């Protein structure tokens, strides 16, 4: 599933660099930013099932006010303030359409056991991904401290994520109804099924993103209400799952197979993945793109795990006063970090030692990157 944060900003920052090699290869002048935006707008409109004439202004594409899932005054007030600082009308419209989109179309606020509960549909599929939901609400953290309504929405995401992790720490996606059957394409997967799980692809980042969101929420608001006994148990579950997937004591309980014509949609060798040495890194069967790993020691997700575990240690120390959890999280972070330094790099013929994308601990390395986060390029963001 796609992480759709700051996409337009990243595109614009790199657009000029993308144009140069394209122009050289094609023997043509670089297109203007305006022309590039219009082309992007046309592609966006096609994807949305609407049409935009070449040369037309970008459409104002927010749902009508009665159809918006969640409206927040602080968010609405921020939009025109930011627009006034943007000189390009097309970028103004992109921001107006994109910044509130999560609130307009994907959140379902409610309550569970008397506490805030927020279901966040990933957008194109009626299921909640741990990764996507964390990323979708991230842009609103800076507004939450002084806004109880927005704070409750975010608390609801954190609480629901904790329940999801306790339901199955190896799952990447969950259904709205915790008793529901899986997503249609996952019904016949050969793995341990649990009610309420949409899909069970083991990805390290699925357990990193909820920590990132919880830590970001705490830093932004100072609020510790979401971090109750249930959240603490979910945090311990994350640490234990990472430990098991270091595979020092065997392969662990997780395996996954799917009958598919697409090799990247299933896991080889009886669902436990290609061979790799237990060097201290955490094994992952899938990438954040939901494609299977070739080598199970997935470097970007392990780098992300080091950061997330240290964020968890900070939360355990300052938000919930659990010294043992803080110690366990920091100890694991140190161990994974050392293993990455020793095994996560490879030698490039021109640039010397660089991070690999995936390794197996035997000396084999995959040299590539993935458009999703975590990837090597996105490490600075995470």
For each predicted feature, which ranges?
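N-terminal secretory signal peptides
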Residues: 1-32, 42-48
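Sec/Tat signal peptide C-region and signal peptidase I cleavage site
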Residues: 52-54
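Low-complexity, Ser/Thr/Pro/Gly-enriched N-terminal "stalk/linker" regions
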Residues: 56-131
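Well-ordered alpha-helical scaffold segments within catalytic/enzyme domains
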Residues: 74-87, 135-148, 209-224, 303-322, ...
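Active-site-adjacent bridging/hinge elements
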Residues: 103-116, 180-189, 275-287
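Short, solvent-exposed segments of well-ordered alpha helices
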Residues: 120-127, 194-201, 205, 229, ...
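Aromatic-rich carbohydrate-recognition surfaces in CAZymes
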Residues: 126-154, 158-264
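Extended ligand-binding clefts on enzyme/binding-domain cores
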Residues: 130, 166-177, 239-306, 318-319, ...
């Amino acid at each position: 599933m796609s992480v759709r944060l700051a996409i337009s900003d990243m595109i614009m920052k790199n657009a000029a660099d993308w144009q140069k090699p394209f122009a050289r290869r094609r023997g043509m002048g670089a297109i203007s930013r305006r022309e590039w935006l219009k082309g992007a707008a046309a592609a966006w409109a096609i994807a949305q099932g609407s049409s935009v004439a070449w040369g037309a202004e970008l459409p104002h594409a927010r749902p009508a006010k009665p159809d918006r899932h969640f409206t927040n005054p602080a968010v609405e007030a921020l939009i025109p303030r930011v627009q006034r600082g943007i000189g390009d009308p097309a970028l103004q419209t992109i921001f107006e359409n994109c910044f509130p989109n999560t609130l307009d179309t994907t959140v379902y606020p409610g309550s569970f056991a008397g506490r805030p509960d927020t279901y966040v549909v990933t957008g194109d599929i009626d299921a909640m991904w741990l990764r996507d939901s964390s990323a979708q609400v991230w842009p609103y953290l800076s507004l939450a401290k002084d806004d109880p309504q927005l704070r409750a929405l975010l608390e609801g995401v954190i609480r629901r994520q904790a329940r999801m992790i306790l339901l199955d720490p190896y799952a990447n996606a969950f259904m709205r109804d915790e008793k529901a059957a899986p997503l249609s394409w996952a019904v016949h997967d050969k793995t341990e099924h649990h009610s309420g799980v949409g899909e069970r692809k083991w990805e390290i980042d699925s357990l990193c993103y909820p920590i990132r969101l919880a830590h970001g929420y705490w830093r932004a608001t100072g609020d510790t209400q979401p971090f109750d006994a249930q959240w603490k148990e979910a945090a311990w579950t994350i640490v234990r799952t990472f430990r098991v997937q270091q595979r020092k004591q065997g392969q662990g309980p997780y395996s996954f197979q799917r009958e598919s014509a697409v090799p990247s949609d299933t896991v080889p060798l009886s669902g436990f993945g290609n061979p790799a040495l237990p060097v201290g890194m955490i094994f992952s069967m899938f990438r954040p793109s939901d494609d299977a790993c070739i080598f199970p020691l997935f470097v970007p997700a392990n780098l992300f795990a080091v950061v997330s575990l240290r964020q968890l240690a900070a939360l355990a120390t300052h938000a919930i006063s659990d010294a043992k959890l803080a110690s366990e999280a920091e100890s694991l972070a140190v161990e994974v970090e050392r293993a990455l330094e020793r095994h996560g790099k490879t030698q490039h013929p021109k640039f010397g030692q660089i991070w690999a994308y995936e390794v197996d601990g035997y000396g084999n390395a995959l040299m590539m990157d993935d458009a999703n986060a975590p990837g090597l390029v996105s490490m600075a963001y995470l």
